[in-house]
């Protein structure tokens, strides 16, 4: 027991924070992404919350976009604000504005790789350059584009946040979230795994990990069909005279 609860045994000891099924799932995602570390959570919002708890503190600010999922926006601008974290909500497609906004108190630059629902796309390498110049991570919610389809690390992303409820789960069988860490800021991963997963109670359930491990096997094939169907639908809608505009990134 002493070995287990001190963390020296390397074996699972308490299923709310370590479980072999969840660990297997994390390792599969790690292999698929080339990440340094992966942490699985019980929802996408749980993953995002843990990342912000790891990088931000009172007096810090998060440089982010005005376009994103509503609950994420509320987390940054309302919930974290109660703990003294400032939200700098700007246009991340305006690189000059980003340069002006990042300062010595910035904790990170955070964005959705494709914004929900506006489908706005920012220049990731430029944002990474600005973030790294200040010594802070670029954190991207990449839920809209599965990690099988692009290399976030090559674009300068330090940490990916994913709602695995979406494409990975696929069949609406389970909820989940992932933090995919590429190792450029190892202190973030240490804080998540050694403190936040223990204290915030947001660890993924073994059943969800099992279902999403199965989902990984068909993710690439399913996404290609979904993307093809979506493009066909968008083109059809665009051809209708009753519709003035179709906001779809692939058109």
Explain the meaning of each model-derived region:
Residues 1-49, 71-78:
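Conserved N-terminal alpha-helix of the aminotransferase class I/II PLP-enzyme fold
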Residues 37-242, 247:
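Conserved PLP-enzyme active-site core in the AAT-like
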Residues 249-251:
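Active-site loops and adjacent core secondary-structure elements that bind or stabilize anionic groups
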């Amino acid at each position: 027991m002493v070995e287990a609860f001190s963390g020296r045994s390397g074996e699972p000891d308490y299923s709310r924070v370590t479980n072999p099924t969840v660990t297997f799932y994390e390792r599969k995602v790690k292999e698929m992404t080339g990440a340094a570390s992966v942490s699985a959570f019980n929802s996408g919002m749980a993953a995002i919350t843990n990342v912000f708890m790891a990088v931000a503190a009172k007096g810090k600010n998060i440089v982010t976009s005005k376009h994103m999922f509503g609950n994420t926006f509320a987390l940054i601008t309302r919930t974290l604000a109660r703990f003294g974290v400032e939200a700098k909500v700007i246009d991340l497609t305006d690189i000059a504005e980003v340069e002006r906004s990042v300062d010595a108190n910035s904790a990170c630059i955070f964005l959705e790789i494709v914004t929900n629902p506006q489908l706005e796309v920012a220049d990731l390498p430029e944002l990474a350059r600005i973030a790294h110049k200040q010594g802070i991570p670029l954190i991207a919610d990449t839920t809209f584009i599965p990690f099988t389809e692009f290399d976030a690390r090559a674009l300068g992303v330090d940490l990916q946040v994913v709602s695995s409820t979406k494409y990975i789960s696929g069949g609406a069988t389970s909820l989940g979230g992932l933090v995919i860490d590429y190792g450029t800021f190892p202190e973030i991963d240490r804080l998540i795994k050694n403190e936040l997963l223990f204290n915030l109670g947001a660890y993924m359930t073994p059943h969800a990990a099992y279902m999403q491990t199965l989902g990984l096997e068909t993710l690439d094939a399913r996404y290609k069909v979904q993307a093809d169907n979506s493009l066909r639908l968008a083109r059809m809608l665009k051809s209708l005279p009753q519709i003035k505009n179709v906001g779809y990134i692939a058109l």
